[in-house]
Amino acid sequence: MVQKQIIRVCQQYQKPVIVATQMLDSMQYSRRPTRAETTDVANAILDGADACMLSGETAIGDHPRRVVEMMRRIAQSTERQYLNSRRQYLDELLGKSRIGAAGNAYLPKPQRLVHGLHPITQAVVEGASRVAAELDARLFVVASKSGVTAIARSKHRGAVPTIGLTDDPATLRQMTLYWGVTPVAVPEEADVNQLLSHVSDWGLQNGRLERGDRIVLVAGIGFGAGGHNMAMVHEV
């Protein structure tokens, strides 16, 4: 319960959450984790952690590569199930499905209100997230100098993958910790058209986009003292 509370508070105050210490401790010597350890990793992800970290398992353990692979497998399996349930839940909210929501009872409630975030930014991210879900967008793109808007999007735990665009190297590194956010560097002072062109080229080259896919972009155009006040839909 304490872990869940700490994660919830960190989300509210825009702090990335890393769950660590003895998560797969038995794998220092064993080639397989215990069921309890597997459950611990899965629960950390379902609680809303941005990352899980290994320590002794890789520092002094007998199977460092194997333990990293095991944590990756547990994380991917858990996230896959989580995102499938989120998609079903969003479909129900948007009236796309008549399936009951009982199966989604275990899902953590997304932390939508982020402490200290500009209210315009918060409202635009909220609305754009719903648009992305309703239009089955392929990517949700956030242009952010500080990375705070990417955190706000991350806390939605949306099923649409998020791309964080920034020209700041420090922000680029920070965004690697944000749940569901893939950081991508862009040229300095790029305008909206340049951002769309850059992310479209990146997506096509990396197999993340195809012609005809939709992108939802959240960016600022100078209104509201740092607030991100613009959301737009772009078709590749």
Language model features by range: what are they?
Residues 17-21, 45, 52-54, 162:
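Hydrophobic faces of well-ordered beta-strands that scaffold small-molecule active sites
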Residues 41-64:
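Glycine-rich phosphate-binding active-site loops on the catalytic face of alpha/beta enzymes
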Residues 12, 72-127:
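Long, charged amphipathic helices and adjacent flexible linkers at domain junctions
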Residues 25-47:
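Catalytic cores of alpha/beta
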Residues 58-81, 229-234:
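C-terminal helical cap(s) of enzyme catalytic domains, especially alpha/beta-barrels
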Residues 149-151, 157-195:
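Nucleotide-binding motor/catalytic cores of P-loop/tubulin-like NTPases across gene-expression machines
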Residues 201, 207-223, 228-234:
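C-terminal binding/interaction regions
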Residues 1-23, 69-86:
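Alpha-helix-loop-beta-strand connector modules within alpha/beta enzyme cores
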